[in-house]
């Protein structure tokens, strides 16, 4: 039923893969490129388990994905039925949201339930990260009844925006401005960024600070230190040019020299719009869940 529903919807671009693991990584790539949630659907049993490696990658890289796993009905779980495993919370902490959907039924109440479920799955994926919707069916390969017409049920959702994830509250732009006020020898260090922002260079220009961009940042902008890793490996260089404050954008550095710099920083500030925990040394003075563009306009 899942595949039939996807195939019947002309607004959905469908890709068919015979291998579940490959299909999940293909969806991961599409989601990375588009920065929009991509759906990957599969049948029940070990097929769902084959999505796990891509789920971990999506969770780590904060890539929006929606996993639709077909399942057997509740009464066939744990009794040795064919192609059945316990798929509830299958991906553990690597799915940022999970729901075990009800069995399909006819009627407006059921349709409204499914509209709410679909909206919430999309909203949660936009946070971003992988979300898991487990879909039990009594007859997994046989469509039942006529196609559902949403009609008036959908009108209640006409004003709902699907483009935003859960609110994290007001960004603490003033707190960042206060933290960097009066600092002359500061440094912006760019780790892996979910959405690379050219506003980081605007912020660096306003502050008058140098920028180090790791390859994983995805930013190729003028003004960054191209030989930074070599310079950071030199204790003599750091003795003279050690910054007062390091502002880390995104994930923690992947290079040994970069990790050493942020780990030994007198003051470390971490900026990530998703409030990513990226402090392996436990040295962060503060984490700011803000976008670089907001900081660039605030740090005047």
Summary of predicted features, one role per range:
Residues 101, 105, 109, 262-300:
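Phosphate/pyrophosphate-binding active-site segments
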């Amino acid at each position: 039923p899942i595949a039939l529903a996807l195939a019947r919807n002309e607004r959905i671009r469908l890709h068919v893969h015979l291998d579940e693991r490959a299909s999940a990584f293909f969806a991961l790539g599409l989601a990375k490129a588009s920065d929009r949630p991509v759906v990957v659907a599969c049948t029940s049993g070990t097929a769902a388990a084959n999505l796990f490696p891509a789920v971990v990658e999506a969770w780590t890289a904060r890539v929006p994905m929606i996993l639709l796993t077909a399942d057997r009905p509740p009464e066939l779980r744990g009794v040795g039925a064919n192609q059945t495993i316990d798929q509830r919370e299958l991906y553990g902490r690597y799915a940022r949201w999970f729901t075990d959907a009800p069995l399909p039924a006819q009627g407006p109440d059921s349709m409204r339930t499914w509209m709410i479920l679909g909206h919430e799955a999309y909203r949660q994926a936009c946070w971003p990260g992988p979300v898991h919707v487990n879909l039990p069916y009594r007859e997994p390969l046989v469509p039942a009844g006529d196609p559902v017409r949403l009609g008036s049920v959908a009108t209640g959702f006409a004003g709902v925006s699907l483009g935003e994830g859960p609110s994290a509250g007001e960004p603490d732009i003033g707190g960042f401005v206060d933290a960097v006020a009066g600092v002359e020898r500061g440094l912006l260090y760019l780790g892996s960024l979910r959405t690379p922002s050219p506003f980081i260079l605007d912020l660096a220009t306003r502050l008058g600070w140098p920028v180090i961009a790791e390859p994983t940042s995805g930013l190729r902008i003028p003004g960054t230190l191209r030989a930074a890793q070599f310079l950071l490996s030199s204790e003599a260089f750091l003795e003279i040019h050690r910054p007062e404050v390091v502002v880390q954008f995104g994930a923690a550095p992947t290079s040994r020299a970069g990790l050493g710099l942020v780990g030994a920083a007198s003051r470390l500030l971490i900026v990530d719009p998703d409030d990513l925990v990226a402090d392996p040394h436990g040295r962060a003075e503060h984490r700011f869940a803000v976008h670089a563009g907001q900081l660039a306009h605030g740090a005047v």
